[in-house]
């Protein structure tokens, strides 16, 4: 196996972390919408935690992207 092929495989494997992050973000927003649908008065309290959860979960995807790009171009 050539080094370039190994880089592509490694970058693809490192990018797999973005799949889990996408699923997590979907779950966060789905549960936020369901919670506000059940109790609209709780929107102000729940919305902040939804944004914080989104940011933390999305950071994992960004870390996976950085690792994939480092494997590919370094």
From Swiss-Prot:
The gene is atpE. This is ATP synthase subunit c. F-type ATPases have 2 components, F(1) - the catalytic core - and F(0) - the membrane proton channel. F(1) has five subunits: alpha(3), beta(3), gamma(1), delta(1), epsilon(1). F(0) has three main subunits: a(1), b(2) and c(10-14). The alpha and beta chains form an alternating ring which encloses part of the gamma chain. F(1) is attached to F(0) by a central stalk formed by the gamma and epsilon chains, while a peripheral stalk is formed by the delta and b chains. Belongs to the ATPase C chain family. It is found in: Cell inner membrane. Keywords: ATP synthesis, Cell inner membrane, Cell membrane, CF(0), Hydrogen ion transport, Ion transport, Lipid-binding, Membrane, Transmembrane, Transmembrane helix, Transport. Its main location: membrane. The record marks 58 as: Reversibly protonated during proton transport. It comes from the Bacteria. The keyword Nucleotide-binding does not apply. PROSITE patterns: ATPASE_C. The chain crosses the membrane at residues 8-28, 52-72. GO terms for molecular function: lipid binding; proton-transporting ATP synthase activity, rotational mechanism. It is a multi-pass membrane protein. Gene3D superfamilies: F1F0 ATP synthase subunit C. It holds the Pfam family ATP-synt_C. HAMAP family: ATP_synth_c_bact.
